[in-house]
Amino acid sequence: MELLEEVWTQYSVLITYIAIYEPNPFHGNKAGHSHKLSLYNSLYLCDGGEDDQNIPLQPLIQPERQVDVVFAYDNSADFQSWPNGNAMIATYQRQFSHQGNGTHFPYVPDENTFINLKLTEKPTFFGCDAKNLTSLTGSLDAAYDTPLIVYTANRPFSYWSNTSTFQMRYDHDQRDSIIRNGFETASRLNLTWDSEWRTCVGCAIIRREQERRGIEQSDQCKRCFERYCWNGKTDTTFVFANFIDACVQFLKRQFKTLQNSTVRWVPYNPVSWFKYLYTRIRWYL
């Protein structure tokens, strides 16, 4: 009971992290589609990640923007401070709510599938074929205006970059190592894991316009999409760890620059664990 009280006390403190701006700069402003922000003298703001949307995708998927492709880099601390796709799921689910406001987002799987099918181990494309999105959008034209998502999750190429959310200070070596690891993650280890990666990025960028014009993909683009597109399969088996020992041993053999000799588990934090359990329970209800 004491442990639950301690966890709830710390979790309650997090709830109070709301910024109140007064006067509200939008008060009385009738421009735009929504007038809810203009009704009150004060403006209440909080971290956008409070609704699990750690990747700020919502502004980019507005139909008026006519965005063809979005590069989504996920540095969430979902489990063991690694991402498991939960941010993508949150944006996908939001389109079915009132707050979705006419936005469309490609199909994505559950968190376990993200891990089991290794969708966080390499860049993954979602929404590769607009014709498969018409059940979401209602028409093919609207599907063409739904951006293709190039999803890349934080991974340890040369540094264990799953630092705690509560770590506020980094020395220069840590900073440089995290930046280097980010470059290696985004570039497929500077193209050493896939020499065609630059071309594959280009294929993702032009895909929607090709579909609008009825232009068939090149053979190289077809290879890229075969390699990186999520094929719709799922594996909902629960996984306890983001990395299995075999994966860690492989990384050790491949990259001699890893900072630690073993997996660096983020120190136990009751608030993080409570939020994780809440997410799991909510998902299965």
How would you label these PLM feature ranges?
Residues M1-I281:
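Catalytic domains of lipid- and phosphate-ester/thioester hydrolases
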